[in-house]
Each structure stands twice: as C-alpha cells, then as structure tokens.
Amino acid sequence: MWIQQLLGLSSMPIRWPGRSLGSHLWILIAMLQLAVDFPSCDSLGPGPEFRLLSRPQRPQRLWSLRTGPPTRLPTPAWSPRAARAERAHGPIQMQTPRARRAHRPRDQVATLGPKGGLTKPPAATRSSPSLTSASASSSMTAGAAEHQSLLKRGRRHTHDAEFNDFDFHGGRPTTETEFIAWGPTGDEEALESNTFPGGFGPTTVSILQTRKTTMAATTTTTAASTATAMTLQTKGVTESLDPWKRTPVGVSTTEPSTSPSNNGKDIQPPRILGETSGLAVHQIITITVSLIMVIAALITTLVLKNCCAPSGHTRRNSHQRKMNQQEESCQNLTDFTPARVPSSVDIFTAYNETLQCSHECVRASVPVYADETLHSTGEYKSTFNGNRSSSADRHLIPVAFVSEKWFEISC
C-alpha cells in the first residue's frame, strides 16, 4: 500500500530544476524504506505468535519537506497473548470468561499508552517542495539510524515478552493463557521497573497492594502456627492477576530478610519444611531407651535383693548351727577319760535299739577298754540321755556322740 503511494508520489510532476535529480531521489528513498522494513517483516513473519492486533496504520515518511527534522516511526503493536489464545481457542471473540478476566489488566495497561519513547508520533504533515536535496539526504540518514535503534528496541522487547510468556508449569503449553507477575521479595524492591519499560505501571501498584495484603495475612497466621513449631515463608509469595493462582517467588530462601518489616516488628528467619524445634527424633529415641534400661536395672536389683535375703539368712543360720555343734563336740572330746569308758558289751546292749548296727561294726569301731570301774546300767543310761545334773558328771564321756561318729565313719 505505502509502496504504491510512494511510487504514486514519485510519478507526480515535481517543479524542481532538474527533473531527473528529483526522480532519482524518490527512488533512493523508496529503496531505503524497503531495506529498513525488511528486518521488521522478518522478525514478525516466522513466528505466528506475534500478530498485529489492529489494522496497520499508514506508515510515516522518514522525512518531511515541510517540517524538516525526521519524525519517529510508530512501533507495531503486537501481543503474544492474543496469538496464543487464538491458536488454542480459535478466534479471540470465542474466549472463555476466565481467560477474558485474565486479559483485562493487560488490556487496561495497553489503553493507558506506552511510555519511554514508544508514544505515537504526531500526525505527519504533507510534504511541500521547499527544501533542497542536501537537507533531505541528511535528515534521511538521521531518520534511518533512529529507525534502526527503534527496531532493535522492539526486537528486544519481543524476546523478553516471549521469555516471560513461557509456561513454567511442567514445560508444556497450556490451553489457557497465564500472566506471571514477577514480584520482588522485599519492600525496597517493590517499585522496580518491570521488563517492559513503562508498560506495567498499574500492574506494579497492584502487585505492591497484593504483597501488603499477603504480609498482613502472614502476620495473623504466624501466631497460630507457633504451636506446631513450623513456619512457612509467605512473604515471597506474590499473587498473579488471577485470584486462584499464585506464583511462589523466594520460598526456598533460608536467610532472613534485611528489609525493614511492617510496624517495626522483626520477622523471624524462615524455616525449612519438616524441621521441628527441640530435640531430634534419634535423640528422643536414645533418651527413652536409656531411661528404660535404668528402670529395668533398678527393678532387677530390688527383686534379687528380696529373693536372696531369706535364703542367705537360712544359710547363715544353718552354718551357725553347724559351728555350734562342732564346738560342743570338741569340748566334749577334751573331757575324754579312758578309766570311765564302758566296755563294748555295755555299749551294744545300751544302744542296740537306736543305732541299728551289727556286732562287728560296733566291735570294730569302738576300742575295747578295761572293765574295772563301771557304773550301773541305770547310771549309764542316765549319762547317755544327757541328764547331767551337776558339773561333777562332766568327767563322763558322751558315749552317744562318740558311738554315732564312729558309726557314720565305719558304716
């Protein structure tokens, strides 16, 4: 369209002295315009992501014969989101209400008008044959340089928009478009400029308000979560333009934020998920096992002491009884007197019923002594029965004890 217009202007009669010079100048301008527009067409051509939202306006000339200085070219207004939505759902008019709500902030931003040197130039005036060819060539060179810089800037914005529009949820394309609001983790970074210079002013304000609301909710939930000793860092979580989607930013940070907190309160450093305050699990298990072992040792000691005390007392009593018997036997043996020992016949006849031993055993075990001074049988029996009334009878031998010992040894 504009090439035909340029060719039509070049075919118009020019009232310059030197018609051939003016014709060659118009041809040179048309060729330069084609050379400048080809890179922009190549950048927009291969990718179907970038399509023009509206009908392209009439291109502005590189220079004007009436105003003199070159005018700025308008940058093409493309939107990657519109292309994705059209490819996934068909025409733009067939989008769901959910997608239309997601596009609403972007559309509002677009209506505010871009900043940073991307504003539309004023309407160019018609050219008038009042300048010379020298001024035209200088203005054409300056306009070409500025147009190249604008094309580079637009191409950089295009790559940034393509990178920011990439879906990070699994690396697969989603049928529903999503706008990622990259937000800072601190208050001092809330007013930083976004990737598109001057294009997201209202978005920055909404992100800041969302962060204030999120931090206020975090302050109320932190008091309730102290009982479980598990805190989560929600300061770095920024909500997207959709209220049901959130993009966590800075959740994995383990260092406390050095930025001043709200109301002058210090924010506790974030903790790792699953970490509990106090003793670890293996420490609790070790302490429990140690206590159980100590209690078992005490119970075992008490049981053994109670069980062994009666048996030890009984053993001690029996040992004491044996010692007493040995002492008595030794004392009785010291009073041994051979003159008063009865004969073997008397011993056998006196103790035959109690010892139940044969005549040979008694004769072999008990030595035969002289039967000179023997007492009567009744007196001997009284001596055997142990009825020693006075100390005078201590010179008698305890015949029962001696005969019993010899009986045990021999029989």
Curated annotation (Swiss-Prot):
Keywords annotated in UniProt: Cell adhesion, Cell junction, Cell membrane, Membrane, Signal, Transmembrane, Transmembrane helix
Keyword NAD belongs to the record: no
Taxonomic superkingdom: Eukaryota
GO biological process, one term: regulation of polarized epithelial cell differentiation
Single GO cellular component term: cell surface
Extracellular side: 44-283
Record's compositionally biased regions (Low complexity): 62-76, 121-145, 247-264
Bilayer disposition of the protein: Single-pass type I membrane protein
Secretion signal, residue range per the UniProt entry: 1-43
Residue spans, topological domain Cytoplasmic: 305-411
Region span, Targeting signals: 304-411
Transmembrane segments: 284-304
Chief location category: membrane
Residue segments, region Disordered: 62-156, 242-270
A Pfam family per the record: AJAP1_PANP_C
Compartments reported by the entry: Basolateral cell membrane; Apical cell membrane; Cell junction, Adherens junction
UniProt GO MF annotations: beta-catenin binding; protein domain specific binding; protein-containing complex binding
InterPro entries: AJAP1, AJAP1_PANP_C
Function: Plays a role in cell adhesion and cell migration.
Subunit structure: Forms a complex with CDH1 and CTNNB1; interacts directly with CTNNB1. Interacts with AP1M2 and with isoform 2 of BSG/CD147.
Protein name: Adherens junction-associated protein 1
Natural source organism: Rattus norvegicus
Gene name, Swiss-Prot/TrEMBL: Ajap1
